[in-house]
Swiss-Prot record:
Subunit structure and binding partners: Has multiple subunits with at least A(3), B(3), C, D, E, F, H, I and proteolipid K(x).
Any matching Pfam family: ATP-synt_ab
Membrane topology: Peripheral membrane protein
Protein family according to the UniProt entry: Belongs to the ATPase alpha/beta chains family.
Record-given protein name: A-type ATP synthase subunit B
Record-linked SUPFAM superfamilies: C-terminal domain of alpha and beta subunits of F1 ATP synthase, P-loop containing nucleoside triphosphate hydrolases
Gene Ontology MF terms: ATP binding; proton-transporting ATP synthase activity, rotational mechanism
Length: 465
C-alpha cells in the first residue's frame, strides 16, 4: 500500500548521484521524491530501487551539498510527470523541463508520465510518406520516412550539430496542410553548443514551431536520463492529441549512455560490454520505440537520434545496439570532412530501411527509386577505382573508368556537399542526380529504365526544351 506524502530524515548514504533512505514503507519503483536541504532548497528525485524498508533514490539536480543528517525526503506517491501544453511551442527548457528562456512557467493542459503509455503493436501504422530535410544526401539517397527512427552516426569533432540544426530548421512534410513541429533534446552539450542551437532556431524563425530541451555539460549527468523522455512525452502530446507531424532530434545519445553507465556503476551492478549496463539495449529501446504512427491518428513521431561513436568505432556498444533497434543509419565520414565537404555524409555505409516505402510515384517522383540505385552504383564504382589508381596510376584506366572517377568527385562536391543554409527541394535533388549521371555513357545507366532516361536525362530534356 502506497503512503504518499510520507516524509523521512533517515538518509543513510549519499554516493554519486544516488542516496539511500532507510526505514521507508510503501515506496514504489519510479516514484517521484521531493528532497529538501537544511537551507530550504528543494530538489527532485526518483526511486531507482525499492526493497523492504530501504529505497535508492536518484537525485536529478545532483547530490552536491546534501547532508545525510539534515536532508529531508518526501515520497509523493506519483510517477514523474511533465506538464504539457501547446504553449510549449517556441519555448526553451532545461533537461528536466524548467523554462530557461526568461518566459513564464507553462500553465499545463495536462500532466503526462515521462515514460509514456505502452503502445499495442497491433495499433501501430506502418511508416510511410516522405519527410523533406532539404539535404540531398538524405532526401535522395537515404530518405527519411514519417514515423521512422533514423539515427546519425557521427564522430568527435564532426559537424553533427550543424547538420542537426539544419534538419530541424528545414524539415517539412510535403503536400497538404500538415502541421509540423520539431522537438529538440540535447544532452551533455557545452554552453557554446547550446547558444549555437538557440541562435540557429531564433534567427531563422524555426523556434516558433519547436520545443527545445537543453541539458548542459555541467548539469548533473542524472538529468540526461530524463531529458529524452521529457522530449518524447511532449512529442506524443503534440502528435496524438493535436495531429501534428513531429520530428524528434536527440543529441548526443552517447552522453545519455555514459550517464546510464555512471548510475549503473554507482549502484554497483555487474557491468556488461565496456562497462555499460547489461540492460542498455532495453533502456535504449524504451526511447527509440516511442517513434511511429498509430492507426486512426493523423499525427506521427519521427526520430533522428545523433550519437558520436567513440574512436569512430561503429562496433562500439552504443552504435551497435542502436543499429539493432532503429531502421537504418546516416554515417558521417571523417575523410569527406577533411576534404572540406559539408555535410560529410558517406552514402555507401548509410542506409534507410524504410526508404522504399516513402519514395516513388505519388510520394517523391517516379524515377527516384531507380535513380538512387544508379547513383549508388556509379559512386561505389568511382570509389573502387580511386583505390585502384593509388596502386597502378590513372594511365592504366579506360576512358569509361576515368568518367567514373570524375563522377565520384563531382558527386561529392556537388550532390553531397551543400551550404549550411541551402534548402534543396526533392525536385532539385533528383535533377542534380541526373545532371551528374550525364557524365557517364548512357550505356552505363543499367539500373534505370529507358523511359526515365528519355524523360529526365539532361540530353533529352534540352531537346524537349
Amino acid at each position: 500500500m502506497l503512503m504518499p506524502g510520507m516524509e523521512y530524515s533517515t538518509v543513510s548514504k549519499i554516493y554519486g548521484p544516488l542516496m539511500i533512505v532507510q526505514g521507508v514503507k510503501g515506496v514504489a519503483y519510479g516514484e517521484v521524491v521531493e528532497i529538501e536541504t537544511e537551507s530550504g532548497e528543494k530538489r527532485k528525485g526518483q526511486v531507482l530501487e525499492a526493497r523492504q524498508d530501504m529505497a535508492i533514490v536518484q537525485v536529478f539536480e545532483g547530490t552536491r551539498d546534501l547532508d545525510i543528517k539534515t536532508t529531508r525526503v518526501r515520497f509523493t506517491g506519483e510517477t514523474l510527470k511533465v506538464p504539457v501544453s501547446m504553449d510549449m511551442l517556441g519555448r526553451v527548457f532545461n533537461g528536466i523541463g524548467k523554462p530557461i528562456d526568461g518566459g513564464p512557467e507553462i500553465i499545463p493542459e495536462d500532466r503526462r508520465d515521462v515514460h509514456g503509455a505502452p503502445l499495442n503493436p497491433v495499433a501501430r501504422a506502418y511508416p510511410r510518406d516522405f519527410i523533406q530535410t532539404g539535404v540531398s544526401a538524405i532526401d535522395g539517397m537515404n530518405t527519411l520516412v514519417r514515423g521512422q527512427k533514423l539515427p546519425i552516426f557521427s564522430g568527435s569533432g564532426l559537424p553533427h550539430n550543424m547538420l542537426a540544426a539544419q534538419i530541424a530548421r528545414q524539415a517539412k512534410v510535403l503536400g497538404e496542410e500538415e502541421q509540423f513541429a520539431v522537438v529538440f533534446a540535447a544532452m551533455g552539450i557545452t554552453y557554446e553548443e547550446a547558444n549555437f542551437f538557440k541562435k540557429s532556431f531564433e534567427e531563422t524563425g524555426a523556434i516558433e514551431r519547436a520545443v527545445l530541451f537543453l541539458n548542459l555539460a555541467d548539469d548533473p549527468a542524472i538529468e540526461r536520463i530524463i531529458t529524452p523522455r521529457m522530449a518524447l512525452t511532449v512529442a506524443e502530446y503534440l502528435a496524438f492529441d493535436y495531429d501534428m507531424q513531429v520530428l524528434v532530434i536527440l543529441t548526443d545519445m552517447t552522453n545519455y549512455a555514459e550517464a546510464l553507465r555512471e548510475i549503473s556503476a554507482a549502484r554497483e551492478e555487474v557491468p556488461g560490454r565496456r562497462g555499460y549496463p547489461g540492460y542498455m539495449y532495453t533502456d535504449l529501446a524504451t526511447i527509440y520505440e516511442r517513434a511511429g504512427r498509430v492507426r486512426g491518428k493523423k499525427g506521427s513521431i519521427t526520430q533522428m537520434p545523433i550519437l558520436t561513436m567513440p574512436d569512430d568505432d561503429i562496433t562500439h556498444p552504443i552504435p551497435d545496439l542502436t543499429g539493432y533497434i532503429t531502421e537504418g543509419q546516416i554515417v558521417l565520414s571523417r575523410e569527406l570532412y577533411r576534404k572540406g565537404i559539408y555535410p560529410p555524409i558517406d552514402v555507401l555505409p548509410s542506409l534507410s530501411r524504410l526508404m522504399k516505402d516513402g519514395i516513388g510515384k505519388g510520394r517523391t517522383r517516379d524515377d527516384h527509386p531507380q535513380l538512387s540505385q544508379q547513383l549508388y552504383a556509379a559512386y561505389a564504382e568511382g570509389r573502387s577505382l580511386r583505390d585502384l589508381v593509388a596502386v597502378v596510376g590513372e594511365e592504366a584506366l579506360s576512358e569509361t573508368d576515368r568518367k567514373y572517377l570524375k563522377f565520384a568527385d563531382r558527386f561529392e562536391r556537388e550532390f553531397i556537399a551543400q551550404r549550411y543554409d541551402e534548402d534543396r527541394s526533392i525536385e532539385e535533388t533528383l535533377d542534380l542526380g541526373w545532371e551528374l549521371l550525364a557524365e557517364l555513357p548512357e550505356s552505363e545507366l543499367k539500373r534505370v529504365r529507358k523511359e526515365y532516361i528519355l524523360k529526365y536525362h539532361p540530353k533529352y530534356r534540352k531537346r524537349e526544351g
